[in-house]
Structure formats: C-alpha cells, structure tokens
Amino acid sequence: VTIPAGWALSRKNMPGKKFLMMYFIIPMFFGGGLIPFYNVMSNLGLINTIWAIVLPSILSVWNLFMTKTFFESSVPNGLIEAAKIDGAGHFRTFTSVVLPLAKAILAVMALYYAVGQWNSYFNAMIFLQDESMYPLQLVLKEILIASESTVGGSGETILQQYRLANQLKYVSVIVSSLPVLMLYPFV
C-alpha cells in the first residue's frame, strides 16, 4: 500500500494532493488514543485474530513520506512522459517504468516493515487473548517475567536462579535478534 500511495502523492498534477497530505500528517502527529482504537478493532470483529496485528501496520505514514520523497527525487518526468507518448496508462507506467527504478526503496520498505512487524508486541498484547497466537516478542516477554520470580531457598540457590534468569535473558535477546541480523546484509 505504501509504494503505490507514495507514487500517487509524488505526482504534481494529482487532484486533492494537499488534502490527502494533511489527512495523513495530522493523525501522524496527533494519535486518536488507545480506547477508540480498541473500540474500532472490536467493532470490526478483529479481536483475537491475526488481522488485529496485520491491518494496523499496513501503512506507515513515515514510510509513505519516504517513498513519496524518493519518487519525487529519483524518477525523471521525462520517463513518465515517454511512457504516456507510448500509450501507457497510469498503472502500466507504474508497473513497467517506475517499479524497476524503485528497487532501492522497495528493499528499504520491505526491511522497515519486516523489522517493524518483528519487533511489534504492543498490538498483540492488547488484541490477542489466545496465547498460541502470540508473536515471539510477547512469548519472550512472558518467559522473562516468569524467570524474574524467585521461589526462595538458601543464598546459593537464589544466586543460581539469578544466574539462570540472566542467561535466559541473554539467550532470548539473541534468539529474537538473530533473524533480523541475518536479514540486514541482504537488503
């Protein structure tokens, strides 16, 4: 959704461009609040579904402005005019001319959205009650909270529990960071 919207907003002759820009900018700075957000998700029947996690992150306004700026600065108007002369419509121009030139922004947006989804836990914490649907970060949070509690015993036992809890924290951080670290060199 971000790439086509960024392309559309980058066109100088798009009708209603200023209105749409304000439509995106105002909610970016002034959030509507958590309770209305929960009510909307509840009224749409998305509570305890995977869509409660996917749909809110389908468009990032910051990423939209990055793609808009990329298209404004990197796609020459001469190519767009040449495509029009050759008989290409808006969709054909976008898919055949613009997208091949936009591989860099496509890779960056894929990385940003992937890392954002990977690190996301707050929406899952609010909208998911079924623990089998929890993302990795929420499962790791539960493990870390459970490892913090000490049952008691002698000083040596408590020290061993503390060391084990610290090791569990470090392993959790590595496990949750490894896929993203493996992805970065290829983007």
Regions from the PLM with identified roles:
Residues 1-187:
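A hydrophobic, multi-pass inner-membrane permease signature
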